[in-house]
Design a protein with these regions (language model features):
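An exposed tryptophan-centered "aromatic clamp" motif
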Residues: 102-106
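Low-complexity acidic/polar repeat-biased segments
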Residues: 1-12, 20-21, 108-155
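Acidic, glycine-rich calcium-binding repeat modules characteristic of RTX/beta-roll
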Residues: 20-24, 28-101
Length: 155
């Protein structure tokens, strides 16, 4: 397990029609905690956030590549691979990426995806632009697999 610094609790809850309650963060570093016992959607926004899952289905959703960059990524806590999901479909759509290439080495070309697992922390890295930092998310205490990630959402 990684050592986790304490961040202030933040975000604003909304209740979209026909969707689970959604907690949206700001561009500040903050801790967003899902509702216990019911489905929740957590959207961190900018800054290196901590998104905390609770009992019940949680969706950790990303809309822009700047929501979690490789030089200061978000950390997901209490991720349950049997019912939770990381949704990066908005990041890919925002960057006009229509195909991905999952590989073992670092991402080189736009659309390349790398999943690593070291010392109890998994990291998802996606090359979203030719230059600049990659989109990146750390998942504490879970061996992250491609089936835990929604790359292309069908709406």
């Amino acid at each position: 397990m990684s050592s986790i610094e304490s961040l202030p609790t933040g975000g604003t809850w909304t209740h979209p029609e026909n969707s689970p309650p959604t907690l949206r963060g700001t561009d500040q570093r903050e801790r967003l905690e899902a509702k216990r016992g019911e489905p929740s959607v957590l959207i961190g926004g900018g800054g290196a956030d901590q998104l905390v899952g609770r009992q019940g289905e949680n969706i950790f959703k990303y809309e822009k590549s700047t929501d979690s960059l490789s030089d200061d990524p978000d950390t997901l806590l209490n991720f349950n691979p049997k019912e939770d999901e990381i949704d990066v479909s908005g990041v890919l759509k925002d960057n006009n990426i229509s195909a991905i290439n999952i590989q073992s080495g670092p991402p080189v070309d736009v659309g390349d995806v790398q999943l690593t697992h070291e010392f109890g922390v998994s990291t998802l890295n996606i090359k979203v632009t030719p230059e600049g930092p990659n989109f990146s998310v750390r998942v504490d205490g879970v061996h992250l697999l491609p089936q835990h990630i929604n790359f292309f959402h069908s709406d």
